[in-house]
Amino acid sequence: MKRIFTLCVALCTIASSFAQTDTTATPQPAPQDDTIRIGGMVIIRKAGSKDKEIIRDKEYKMRNRRTDKPSNLSTNWWIFDLGFSNYNDQSNYTAAAVSGFVAPGIGEDQLKLRAGKSRNVNVWIFMQKLNIAKHVLNLKYGMGIELNNYHFENDKIVFAKNPTYISQGTTEFKKVKLAADYLTVPMMLNINFTPKRKNGFGLSGGISAGYLYSARYKTKDGKDVEKVKSDFDLERFKLSYIGELSLGPVRLYGSYAMKNMWEKGLDMTPYTLGFRFSNW
């Protein structure tokens, strides 16, 4: 009987000790801090607190910038110019008539040009730009053809060849023009004020040397077109002062010959002005 009583007391003691400890409860993890990254900053919010701590990273990512350097020698193919041709007439028509180059009565008014119709078209096969100093100072050169069309206001003017003789005809044509085409090599010193920009601002100046490879007198009367091919005593070689102005995407060009365009008879200095269509 005593053994049974002692066993019951022992069992009750063990059961009460197990009842004091909850073995089914799961342990809760400790609260974590909130971390937010914005660019080069890290914002940390402490657990259970309204305070925020801002930490700046020491590492920065650089923006992707174009690092390509301009080439020291660049080539531009097939450049086109579109402008106007004219000339400064300082001819002595009395002397020209005496020499038999022009007919009596031919003067400055008879050889006056139509400003809006007298066109200049240049086609440059290529132009190159050579860097001299930091792409600000450059040398530009190339090769191409100059096409000059001198349209006369006087629709009765007539050009004869071998020998050259300019006279007043009786037929009134719809169009009368003298065309002079040159193979030309230009060379200019270029100043680029914005070398890192594609369409920047700059100016160029220099000289060009041209060779007259074709000339013709052309008339048009309705559907009838007549051409007389001859050099008409025009100078074979032409030296000109040339210039170019770059205003962003707009480019202007101009030229002024160094001397008279005729070998004899007349004294006319040609010049041109217009727009240039090129990459630089």
Give the residues covered by each predicted segment.
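Cleavable N-terminal export/targeting peptides
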Residues: M1-T67
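Predominantly the C-terminal beta-signal and adjacent terminal strand-loop region
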Residues: S230-W280
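Outer-membrane beta-barrel transmembrane domain signature
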Residues: N131, E172-L247
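Short loop/turn motifs that connect adjacent beta-strands in outer-membrane beta-barrel proteins
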Residues: R66-S74, D89-S91, L130-L137, T194-G200
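Residues on the lipid-exposed face of transmembrane beta-strands in outer-membrane beta-barrel proteins
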Residues: K69, F80, V123-K129, M143-I145, ...
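Residues that define the transmembrane beta-barrel architecture of outer-membrane proteins
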Residues: S74-W78, A115-V121, A179-L183, N199, ...
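Transmembrane beta-strands of outer-membrane beta-barrel pores
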Residues: F84-N88, K129, I145-H151, I207-Y213, ...
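Surface-exposed strand-loop-strand hairpins of Gram-negative outer-membrane beta-barrel proteins
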Residues: Y87-N120
